[in-house]
Amino acid sequence: MSLLEQLDKNIAASGGLIVSCQPVPGSPLDKPEIVAAMALAAEQAGAVAVRIEGIDNLRVARSLVSVPIIGIIKRDLDDSPVRITPFLDDVDALAQAGAAIIAVDGTARQRPVAVEALLARIHHHHLLAMADCSSVDDGLACQRLGADIIGTTMSGYTTPDTPEEPDLPLVKALHDAGCRVIAEGRYNSPTLAAEAIRYGAWAVTVGSAITRLEHICGWYNDALKKAAS
């Protein structure tokens, strides 16, 4: 059974939750052993996969969890806005560290390495390639280039203003076009995650609402302050 077939089976049985275990940078939780513990807790709670950033975090998580890991490396480049797995060496390192799926930025922006080359390198390692996209055009272009999975990860993050709501119409449009879609980006409630499935998502990635304690506390603090004013 291929990994995609196994994931199809697990998603049908468990509902399609993927947990992104990426603490706020510099947080007290931003340590490989804590990231790995989050990943294990997510697996034990029914997540069908986890998304992990960074080689050290991935290696430790891989030693604890049995579900597939979506691996990424984030970089801040001087000459490109692309942050997610921009280099071929990043793909190689993630493959060596134990990622089953490697995600790359799939947007049509200036970049050090072409999306096509990154996807080909992932497939060279016999792993699944995921493209983090911002639009239907991005997603369809990446699908034509061989991406196995299209994520809506970058929707709302390539323009100055980020909306509060997730991009459900993008999920539907990509699904209707024949893409295997992971809905990601601002799915900060079970209701929104469930809505993504109704719109055609194959699975839904949730990050901040589960693993970023500072964000969750901020939401509660803001609501309480507003109620008290």
Swiss-Prot record:
One of its GO terms (cellular component) is cytosol. Its EC number is 5.1.3.9. Keywords: Carbohydrate metabolism, Isomerase. Gene3D superfamilies: Aldolase class I. InterPro entries: Aldolase_TIM (IPR013785), NanE (IPR007260), RibuloseP-bd_barrel (IPR011060). It holds the Pfam family NanE. Pathway: Amino-sugar metabolism; N-acetylneuraminate degradation; D-fructose 6-phosphate from N-acetylneuraminate: step 3/5. The keyword Magnesium does not apply. The keyword Isomerase applies. One of its GO terms (molecular function) is N-acylglucosamine-6-phosphate 2-epimerase activity. It catalyses: an N-acyl-D-glucosamine 6-phosphate = an N-acyl-D-mannosamine 6-phosphate. GO terms for biological process: carbohydrate metabolic process; N-acetylmannosamine catabolic process; N-acetylneuraminate catabolic process. Belongs to the NanE family. Converts N-acetylmannosamine-6-phosphate (ManNAc-6-P) to N-acetylglucosamine-6-phosphate (GlcNAc-6-P). NCBIfam families: PRK01130.1. This is Putative N-acetylmannosamine-6-phosphate 2-epimerase 2.
